[in-house]
Design a protein with these regions (language model features):
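Conserved helix/coil segment N-terminal to the catalytic DExD/H
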Residues: 150-173
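Conserved pre-motif I regulatory segment
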Residues: 2-16, 33-36, 42-92
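Conserved SAM-binding loop
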Residues: 72, 119-120
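Conserved helix-turn-beta segment of the N-terminal RecA-like "Helicase ATP-binding" lobe
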Residues: 117, 124-152
Length: 173
């Protein structure tokens, strides 16, 4: 309707002239541009919040939450630390590189901070795999993790929900 009414040309833009807003993920690029070109940028409080928790603190945290037989690899620890320190990021990791362990560490940190987590995976088999992996990593999954797909209902008390997007689409708001 907006296209037909000639209020919108159908293009999605990263900056909105109407609202004056920019996608938050672009802030570092705007900062870099401003620094490079000698411009001053003033950001609202909290917009550029990134943590500076030392890597050793993450290592100690991981040692506490994993079973003794599991060891986290350096690149997994780096990815975990990056995700927590930067709060918003995309982590790209190849097949069989231990993504589930990275996700587990992030979710355990969020749970420790009193936050709830929603993990959306593409298939029901991955819902089950993540649930089993969390048990293997030392979490008592039945107390903390809720699986959401056909046959399972949401337990509001559990801090972690693992679901497919299709199951969430049918979930009552």
């Amino acid at each position: 309707p907006s296209v037909r009414a000639k209020r919108w040309d159908g293009k999605i833009r990263l900056y909105s002239k109407a609202t004056g807003k920019l996608y938050r993920g672009l802030v570092p690029y705007v900062q870099h541009f401003c620094e490079k070109n000698g411009h001053t940028i003033i950001l609202p409080d909290g917009l550029n919040r990134t943590g500076s928790v030392p890597r050793d603190d993450f290592s100690k945290f991981v040692d506490k939450i994993l079973t003794k037989s599991l060891k986290i690899r350096d690149y997994q620890l780096d990815a975990f630390a990056h995700a927590i320190n930067h709060r918003r990021c995309i982590l790209l990791s190849p097949t069989a590189s231990g993504k589930s362990l990275i996700i587990y560490c992030i979710i355990r940190m969020m749970t420790t901070l009193g936050k709830r987590s929603l993990l959306v995976v593409p298939t029901t088999s991955l819902v089950e795999q993540m649930y089993k992996d969390f048990e293997d990593y030392s979490l008592k999954a039945e107390d903390y993790v809720q699986r959401k797909y056909y046959g399972y209902e949401i337990d509001e008390k559990k801090p972690v929900v693992v679901s497919t997007w299709q199951s969430l689409a049918t979930f009552d708001k």
